[in-house]
């Protein structure tokens, strides 16, 4: 068999160094697939178990201003999308960490009855009551730290959740710096750490923020 016949019908020979370099160059020039955005696990001194905890950041700083000295309020909505086995509401633990400039002593409180209407978070009840579902701690590293479990609603245990529920928090400037009537505070970062027990299955949280500047905004909505 001639060399031309070998090329036509025989086995292909080994690639030359030149062809290898050309293939490598072509591969390097191909567009790379977009990188996956994986939640960053941050070190923490929380009392909650570390296994399975996921940190999620809002991405952009959150600025709050007190226009009337009554404080500023904001709303977090957690969209719970469960796929898998039935879970218990107490299987979900959330931890919020607030990094605030300037350092300031504030008061957090939570409404205990929060629902949604037409995909919009709606808070009911007295927004100025004591925080019933968690504990507020000073955190030297981050500023403020709030640890709480998901509020328990009557008849919600042992069910699959196909709705969202919201947590309404308010920050009251009860220890304003001397000489400051309307202080402004910038939330550098707001994280939400969630802990789901293994039996809870996959969990996806969608975080949305709404600002409330008037004293009765939460009551009106």
UniProtKB/Swiss-Prot annotation:
Transmembrane segments: none
Modified sites of kind N-acetylserine: 2
Subunit structure comment from the entry: Interacts with Arabidopsis ALKBH9B.
Keyword Zinc: no
Its job: Capsid protein. Binds to the to the 3' end of the nonpolyadenylated viral RNA and is involved in viral RNA translation initiation. Probably binds RNA and plays a role in packaging.
Residue ranges, annotated region (Disordered): 1-24
Disulfide-linked positions: none
GO cellular component assignments: ribonucleoprotein complex; T=3 icosahedral viral capsid; viral nucleocapsid
Keyword hit for Acetylation: yes
Keywords, comma-separated and alphabetical: Acetylation, Capsid protein, Host-virus interaction, Ribonucleoprotein, RNA-binding, T=3 icosahedral capsid protein, Viral nucleoprotein, Virion
Localisation per UniProt entry: Virion
Chief place of localization: virion
Protein family: Belongs to the alphamovirus/ilarvirus capsid protein family.
Official protein name in the record: Capsid protein
GO terms assigned for molecular function: RNA binding
């Amino acid at each position: 068999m001639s060399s031309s016949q070998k090329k036509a019908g025989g086995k292909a020979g080994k690639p030359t160094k030149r062809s290898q370099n050309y293939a490598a160059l072509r591969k390097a020039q191909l567009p790379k697939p977009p990188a996956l955005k994986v939640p960053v696990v941050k070190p923490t001194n929380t009392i909650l178990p570390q296994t399975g905890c996921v940190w999620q950041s809002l991405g952009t700083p959150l600025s709050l201003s007190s226009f009337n000295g009554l404080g500023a309020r904001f709303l977090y909505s957690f969209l719970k999308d469960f796929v898998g086995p039935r879970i218990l509401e107490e299987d979900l633990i959330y931890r919020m960490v607030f990094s605030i400039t300037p350092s300031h002593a504030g008061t957090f409180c939570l409404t205990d009855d929060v629902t949604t209407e037409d995909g919009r978070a709606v808070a009911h009840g007295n927004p100025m009551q004591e925080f019933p579902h968690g504990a507020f701690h000073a955190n030297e590293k981050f500023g403020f730290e709030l640890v709480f479990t998901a509020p328990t609603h009557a008849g919600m245990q042992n069910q699959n959740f196909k709705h969202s529920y919201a947590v309404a928090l308010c920050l009251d400037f009860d220890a304003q710096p001397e000489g400051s009537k309307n202080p402004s505070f910038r939330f550098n970062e707001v994280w939400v750490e969630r802990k789901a027990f293994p039996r809870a299955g996959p969990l996806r949280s969608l975080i949305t923020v709404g600002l409330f500047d008037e004293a009765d905004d939460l009551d009106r909505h």
